[in-house]
């Protein structure tokens, strides 16, 4: 039977290396909602574009498609989002674009301070 145990650390330098390059951290629903709002405060986006942007802007973080869709559904139920389709020349079918309601911007802005603080606290250690 194969073991899925992590390799043992052989010295303190290995543990230090862990903090230099920690494993990716997956966002839960609350953090995913904040990520979606942070992006949509800047401009409209399509869901897979949000995933690509997270990977680019915060490579230490991960967001599953399932949790992303739960976050979008949550925001739609809160009546904070509009959706529309946009045709892109590079794609055959139109994209489902997400747009933050103008009257939801204040609520979204209130979450940006704790979201930014969380990002700062969970940023990789650099030396």
Regions found by a protein language model. Give the residues of each.
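Amphipathic alpha-helical dimerization/coiled-coil segments
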Residues: 9, 103-127
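Pre-recognition alpha-helix immediately N-terminal to the DNA-recognition helix
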Residues: 34-35
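Short, Lys/Arg-enriched N-terminal segment that forms or immediately precedes the first helix
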Residues: 5-26
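Beta-hairpin "wing" of winged helix-turn-helix
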Residues: 76-93
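DNA-recognition alpha helix
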Residues: 48-60
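Short capping segments at the starts of secondary-structure elements
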Residues: 40-49
